[in-house]
Regions:
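Short, solvent-exposed loop/linker segments at the N-terminal edge
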Residues: 7-17, 107-117, 206-216
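Short strand-edge motifs at loop-to-beta-strand transitions and within beta-strands
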Residues: 51-55, 150-154
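Surface-exposed, short loops/turns at beta-strand junctions within beta-sandwich domains
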Residues: 59-69, 158-168
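Aromatic/hydrophobic beta-strand junction motif of beta-rich domains
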Residues: 21-25, 121-125, 218-224
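Conserved small/polar residues in nucleotide/adenosyl-binding loops
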Residues: 235-240
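Short proline/glycine-enriched turn/loop motifs at strand-loop junctions of beta-rich domains
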Residues: 25-31, 125-131, 225-231
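Hydrophobic/tyrosine-rich beta-strand signature of extracellular beta-sandwich/beta-rich modules
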Residues: 70-74, 171-173
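Flexible, low-complexity linkers/stalks enriched in Thr/Pro that connect modular domains
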Residues: 1-4, 78, 84-102, 177, ...
Length: 240
């Protein structure tokens, strides 16, 4: 038997594809018949002039295989009725790969202070220790590795964070396991580094408080821009 699916492992992508099973029959004659058995299915082919043989297994039959070791068998029969059988093991591994990205900057918002600092990207995966995680932010790839618990993290330098504009960005993390199964996860973060601006209205109409206005009491009013509804304002008294 030749190697199946490139590495004798059928991963989640290959599990949905047709596969070619092939090999070489030593000492066989042209036209000798081979029967390939995979589970309860059989496929028939013949040996060519070079002793080689191959058979296509449809995607529907491959996708019916369950995870674990599958033993393929090839039985060749010559013109005199003599037969010989060889086996070959293939592993089916379609286990799902899990990957997450944690909240960024505590609230998924990069404010003015945080825009001048390093940014930690982190998350979890079900992959073994030292698995490579590729993380992309603003078109730049960063590499992290999983620890023994599946946690991963990587630091985006302050220079790259400060280069971000005022916009929403998507962090994309991706991982591929040792048999080619892959997964990706995304997480959005908002860059909002515009500082609030406070404008005070004229106090008492003319910024002069006379005796009558003192007795009546006055309300301090104004407007705040670059702020969201519900943001808290604070009054500080200066002077007597």
């Amino acid at each position: 038997f030749n190697v199946v699916a490139g590495d004798d492992v059928i991963n989640s992508v290959e599990h949905g594809q047709a596969q070619v099973i092939s090999g070489t029959a030593t000492g066989a004659s042209v036209g000798d018949k081979l029967v390939i058995t995979i589970g309860s299915n059989q496929y028939t082919t013949t040996v060519d002039a070079s002793g080689k043989w191959s058979v296509g297994v449809p995607a529907s039959d491959i996708s019916a295989l369950t995870d674990g070791t599958v033993t393929l068998s090839a039985t060749i029969t010559d013109s005199a009725g003599n037969s010989s059988t060889q086996t070959h093991d293939v592993v089916v591994n379609t286990a799902s790969v899990a990957l997450t990205v944690n909240t960024l900057s505590g609230d998924d918002v990069i404010n003015a202070a945080e825009k001048g600092e390093d940014l930690l990207l982190s998350g979890t995966s079900n992959q073994p220790e030292a698995t490579t995680i590729t993380v992309n932010l603003n078109g730049i790839n960063y590499t992290a590795t999983t620890d023994a618990s599946g946690n991963w993290s990587v630091t985006v330098p302050a220079s790259a964070v400060s280069a971000l504009g005022e916009a929403n960005y998507t962090v994309t993390a991706s991982v591929t396991d040792n048999v080619g199964n892959s997964a990706a996860a995304t997480h959005d973060v908002l860059v909002d580094s515009s500082l609030p601006v406070v404008t005070l209205n004229h106090f008492a109409g003319d910024n002069i408080v006379n005796a009558a206005e003192v007795a009546a009491g006055q309300t301090l009013t104004g407007k705040v821009s670059n702020a969201a509804s519900g943001d808290r304002s604070e009054e500080r008294r200066v002077g007597k």
